[in-house]
Amino acid sequence: MLDVGLLGAKSGLSASVLTDKSAVFREFKGALAEQFVQQQLRAECGIEPHYWQNDSARSEIDFVFQSDMDVVPVEVKAETNTKAKSLLLYCRQFQPRIAVHCSMNDYACQPLPYGINTTLVDLPLYAVSQMN
């Protein structure tokens, strides 16, 4: 499904679930944020995102896409939570030049710790359409 509105409608949740910040919304907002990012990547950026998980299926990256000769991992969080263990594991294993963390945080750009040769770009959810 490529439309965040359709996802919301198909969920059958009432608007009060969103405005009251109920437990159901806390569970649903991650899927909603991921759907929004996928919609923006495809419709606004012309990017065909893919999914990655490691062999043990314990780590996953929400989206990966190719940009020139680079594969760019994208992790999506619906809050200001900056813990992205799977993204760190992916970067440690594959050493991409750039990794993107989409969340409710402000813009930031910083090298990853632990000697990982990757620049982490924090991109606010509202700015995902600027990814390309």
Regions found by a protein language model. Name each.
Residues M1-N132:
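A cross-kingdom feature that marks ATP-driven nucleic-acid transaction machinery
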